[in-house]
Amino acid sequence: MRLDQRMISTFDGERLFVSFSELGHKHWIIMTHGVGEHSGRHHHIAAYFSQFANVCLYDLRGHGKSSGERAYVNDFFSFSRDLMEVMSYLKEEFKMTHYILYAHSMGSLVTCDFIQNHKLIKSDLINKEQGFYPSMIFLSAPPVQPAGWVGGVVKKIPQYWLNVLASFNKSVKIAGILDIFYLSHDVRVFEDYLKDPLNSTKLHTKLLLQIVKRARIVFSRPLGVECPVHVVVGTKDRLVSHKDVIDYFHRLEPNAQMHVVDEGYHELHNEVERIRVKYTNILQDTIIKLIKSS
């Protein structure tokens, strides 16, 4: 489907690519994508939800059609500010009052970071008492901890040394850290990912270390969310440790509702039909159910 497009400015002069479908619905769904990819890989969100809600997709800085050095960020919290800029734009331009934050992978960390720590940027944008607060937060594959050998290495890095490494200005691009072959059981997803020039298969070490550092901070304490939270993860995810995701939300966010998809890889929305249908059923039972009931 056709989406309107805009470029909006950030607090520090970057330009964010935003696309949206505004059809006069009460609710908005704001989608934040994962690391190395871009919002164009999530047009299914607009196609799936447009009959129920307005939809906004955007590219984080350094990703897709937004400005900034490719696959790089100096401070991870800049991504949270990007989300804030998009929300502010929708509130001012379209008088948005009801919205759902939908996020995938690194985008889930961005969303959790913003909800947990928005007061650090002195943002009064989200305020429960003033009636401007998410109706729901939906997190797909939040990166509580990397999967496999990468996760094992990350867990052994003391916080002090992680802070030191993440503070280095020197950064190099490396490939192979993210096993994108296992995004989906559908091999075409991997092939299309490689062909897409807006994807980054090489990521800056600075970005990777900022992700690890921020994830450890955010997922070491409760998020402090005051709305329904739904979390979905596949049991065969090779990028995010599904066991660590389940453990965190059971221990520190017990009110969040977990949805574990058996045999699912990292991108459940791009899975083969027998697995993808489980994901779409979850969307029906959570986001669409909320929208229809309000």
Per-region residue spans from a language model:
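Alpha/beta-hydrolase-fold enzymes
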Residues: 110-204
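Serine-hydrolase catalytic-loop signature spanning alpha/beta hydrolases and amidase-signature enzymes
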Residues: 34-44, 55
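Catalytic nucleophile-loop/oxyanion-hole region of alpha/beta-hydrolase
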Residues: 38, 65-94, 277-278
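Catalytic histidine-centered segment of alpha/beta-hydrolase-like enzymes
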Residues: 264-277
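Conserved alpha/beta-hydrolase
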Residues: 46-69
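Short beta-strand/loop motif that positions the catalytic acidic residue
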Residues: 225, 231-233, 237
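Short alpha-helix in the alpha/beta-hydrolase fold that links the catalytic acid
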Residues: 227, 241-250
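Active-site glycine-rich loops that stabilize anionic/oxyanionic intermediates
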Residues: 33-37, 106, 235
